[in-house]
């Protein structure tokens, strides 16, 4: 066991955290600030995650804070809720149930420090402050033992290295490489959350490089092993938003054998994200952006304004800027070969700005008339025919959005009601894959 190194430091601990520790002390229990907050304060960074370790059992913790909202999601951890924020209070880890034993069973030395509020002292038995100065991520005592306790720590080592700009200590790195397969025993949800934190770091390419170098990536994302540095650099170039970074990760593999264009790429997005239980909404967002980025590769100046409006409608106006940044990130890595695609992208942006001066009709909901007006003009009863006519009108307005006025649409309906109705009915059926003529409401007897 390491020497109990204590260094006196005065820190401004949040009032609620102080009150938690004081109440535990008042009931005769030991209690210390521990983990990430101590690490961040030692580094001169603002601390955001305030955790407490204590000699009290979970039952004793709940008894001390009986009047406070709390819940337990993890073994021997009670989460206290105060003003919408969560604070974890955990019973000492390890068989001896001492502070030193608890710190020995933490993941890395930089996280294996505690703060004694009574003495204003940092307790550092395993050299965490030394490793902060050396800028290394080192497993506590035996990296293999720490990884066996929780294999998610294999990815956490990479994440801390990337987040903090540290390197992984050699013995710890070797342990990761020798134990990569154990990551398969961790729940997909936990892996997902840790991987997202890697992706939204300042340099996600470094995280992906470490995951590939250690051999972890082949167990986590075998579909995305191909691509090397190029894939990571694409992710680096987009804003640190989970949806955008995930989209960039998939788009960057456009030329790989495992990520083909079109339907196959959609299937890959759905398969990978589904495997890690991402929300359906997030899967749809990423799949839509990846599909649109691939479709954008086919953009040409010969596209008509209507073609471009259909593309905008399919992608969604709200996603256009995201799509453009995604496309720019993907083609920039082509080096000299990027000049042509970047010129096309600039021309695309200019055309889009011009077209967007007239609102795009996204569908029947944007028409200047509704179903009641269709039924009145066409003498129809409520039914699917009304919806088909509205959809047909919205399709017509893709080419001519300036026609989206009540007067013009009524005129179009009246024209459809004329002897040319049959022709229009057939065009509606052709567009929407339906058969048969429009059923008109019976004419009143004169």
Please identify what each model-predicted range represents.
Residues 1-446:
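Catalytic cores of the polymerase beta-like nucleotidyltransferase superfamily
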């Amino acid at each position: 066991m390491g020497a109990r190194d204590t260094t006196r430091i005065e820190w401004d601990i949040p009032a609620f955290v102080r009150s938690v520790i004081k109440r535990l002390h008042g009931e005769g229990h030991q209690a210390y600030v521990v983990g990430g907050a101590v690490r961040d304060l030692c580094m001169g960074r603002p601390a955001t995650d305030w955790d407490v370790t204590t000699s009290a059992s979970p039952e004793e913790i709940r008894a001390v804070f009986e009047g406070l909202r709390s819940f337990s999601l993890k073994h021997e951890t009670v989460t206290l809720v105060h003003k919408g924020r969560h604070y974890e209070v955990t019973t000492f880890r390890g068989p001896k149930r001492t502070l030193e034993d608890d710190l020995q069973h933490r993941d890395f030395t930089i996280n294996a420090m505690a703060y004694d509020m009574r003495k204003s002292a940092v307790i550092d038995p395993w050299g965490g402050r030394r490793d902060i100065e050396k800028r290394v991520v080192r497993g506590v005592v035996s990296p293999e033992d720490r990884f066996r306790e929780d294999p998610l720590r294999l990815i956490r080592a990479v994440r801390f290295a990337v987040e903090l700009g540290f390197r992984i200590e050699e013995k710890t790195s070797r342990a990761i490489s020798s134990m990569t397969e154990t990551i398969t025993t961790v729940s997909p949800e936990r892996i997902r959350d840790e991987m997202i934190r890697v992706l939204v770091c300042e340099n996600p390419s470094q995280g992906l490089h470490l995951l590939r170098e250690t051999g972890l990536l082949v167990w986590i994302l075998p579909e995305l092993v191909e691509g090397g540095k190029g894939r990571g650099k694409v992710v680096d170039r987009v804003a640190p938003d989970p949806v955008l970074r995930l989209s960039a990760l998939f788009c960057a593999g456009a030329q790989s054998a495992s990520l083909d264009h079109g339907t196959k790429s959609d299937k890959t997005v759905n398969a990978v994200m589904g495997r890690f239980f991402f929300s359906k909404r997030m899967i749809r967002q990423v799949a839509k952006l990846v599909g649109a980025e691939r479709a954008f590769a086919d953009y040409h100046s010969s596209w008509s304004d209507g073609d471009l409006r259909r593309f905008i409608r399919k992608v969604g106006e709200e996603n256009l800027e995201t799509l453009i940044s995604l496309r720019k990130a993907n083609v920039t890595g082509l080096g000299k070969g990027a000049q042509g695609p970047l010129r096309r992208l600039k021309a695309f942006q200019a055309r889009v700005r011009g077209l967007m001066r007239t609102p795009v009709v996204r569908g029947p909901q944007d028409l200047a008339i509704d179903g009641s007006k269709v039924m009145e003009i066409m003498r129809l009863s409520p039914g699917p025919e009304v919806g088909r006519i509205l959809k047909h009108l919205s399709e017509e307005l893709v080419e001519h959005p300036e026609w989206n006025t009540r007067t013009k649409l009524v005129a179009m309906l009246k024209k459809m009601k004329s002897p040319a109705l049959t022709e229009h009915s057939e065009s509606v059926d052709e567009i929407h894959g339906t058969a048969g003529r429009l059923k008109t409401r019976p004419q009143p007897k004169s």
